[in-house]
Amino acid sequence: MKKFRARYAPSPTGHLHIGNARTALFNYLFARHHGGDFIIRIEDTDVARNVEGGITSQLNNLKWLGMDWDEGVDVGGSFGPYNQLSRLELYKKYAFELLEKGYAYKDFKEGSEDFAIRFKVPENVLYEFDDVIRGTLKFESKDVEDWIILKDNGIPTYNFAVVIDDHYMEITHVFRGEEHITNTPKQLMVYDALGWEYPTFGHMTIIVNEDRKKLSKRDTNTIQFIEDYKNLGFLPEAMLNFLSLLGWSPKDDEEILSKEELISLFDEHRLSAAPSYFDKQKLAYINSRYLKALSMDELKDLTRPFLINHGIEIKNEAWLESLLSILKDRLSYGAEITKYYDQFFHHDFVLEPAVLEEIKEFDNEVVIKGFMGAISSVDFTDDVAINQALKDTGKALNIKGKPLFMPIRIATTGEAHGPSLPVSLSLLGKELVIKRMNKTLEVLKGETK
């Protein structure tokens, strides 16, 4: 059986966009699942729109996501060169072959000997192909006008060059966005004129935003580029996992899947034609699942730069570990550590009525004042000493369990539930703990008036 070969063919006109990353991923998963080759080809003929560093950025972000490729502009291969500007003579050869065979004609510039080569669309021809995702698609030639295949400057147009490249690189399968469906008739015309076999096409669904409109680069409510997610502290494994679910689904309901599992499970026939919703909450959830699986050292390495850039002094490794032990379960991505740090330490301490309702039956004032007395000489860098102060308070007041711990937790953190109370108090520091308990006493006093 012929070896499957799939490709991702970006233009160097910008950084790696969500939609392009998904296109690359589905071609990658297809090739790896079937034991085929994954190729990256650069379509760089639109020189005016090419961005310096655009390709390097795209390739780096694909690698960050965990993808690798068998052939490409950076790794070489037997079917190169892998950028179009290095293949101009090949396009010219076939453009003139079509010209000589009568499938194309010269289109002269007015008042000049310069000419483009325009493809002559045949009359009354029905073009059809079987799309892996959408079934049989048909087009009539009467709906397509004659079109340029080679500009007067020797640069090929997209719909011509892509056929030459896919044929010469022996591409067997092309998975791309549905916006390319309308390009397909022109490409089929070139395949037929040159007597070449079509690759198998699959046109993927559009990605839509929360308004169910097509996600575009102008949509400011959704982060569009992989680089931005990387800079926010999203994990590459989570991003890869999330992207795989934008238009594809496994047979069962399990959605947390490693790259190896995705390769094993991938089935191109489960790609959907229905619009795929870019669910930001789902992305946050998936990333949080991967964050929870990190070791403490990995979590420290992820969050440390965000804390430092936020101007937060990391006192020592033990302090950072204590902070993360309290905040890690709240994190959806790395940069969020600064938001929760600020909420924990610096926000205006507010006691919500619903929280106070949970302790209305307890002897709150007595417990809080008793604990304030017990910590007067306690070293707040010592969790064990703080825990002992809690025990001493309970023993002195003959109170234990919720009636002891909940008033102190609410008085110091503003929350009824949370992680280890001694660790939380140690992080807050004695000065802030006493300040908050005094404020709580004032609030409680006001409620009893």
UniProtKB/Swiss-Prot annotation:
UniProt organism field: Acholeplasma laidlawii (strain PG-8A)
EC number(s) per UniProt? 6.1.1.17
User: Where can the motif 'KMSKS' region be found?
Assistant: 214-218
Keywords attached to this Swiss-Prot or TrEMBL record, sorted alphabetically, are: Aminoacyl-tRNA synthetase, ATP-binding, Cytoplasm, Ligase, Nucleotide-binding, Protein biosynthesis
> Which positions carry the signal peptide feature in this UniProt record?
none
Function of this protein? Catalyzes the attachment of glutamate to tRNA(Glu) in a two-step reaction: glutamate is first activated by ATP to form Glu-AMP and then transferred to the acceptor end of tRNA(Glu).
The reply on keyword Aminoacyl-tRNA synthetase is yes
> What NCBIfam families does this protein map onto?
gltX_bact
Q: Which GO terms describe its cellular component?
A: cytosol
Protein known as: Glutamate--tRNA ligase
Q: What GO biological process terms does the UniProt entry carry, in alphabetical order? A: glutamyl-tRNA aminoacylation
Catalytic activity entry: tRNA(Glu) + L-glutamate + ATP = L-glutamyl-tRNA(Glu) + AMP + diphosphate
Say where the protein is mainly found.
cytoplasm
The broad enzyme category this protein falls into is: ligase
Which residues are noted in the entry as ATP-binding? K217
The yes or no answer to whether the keyword Ligase is present is yes
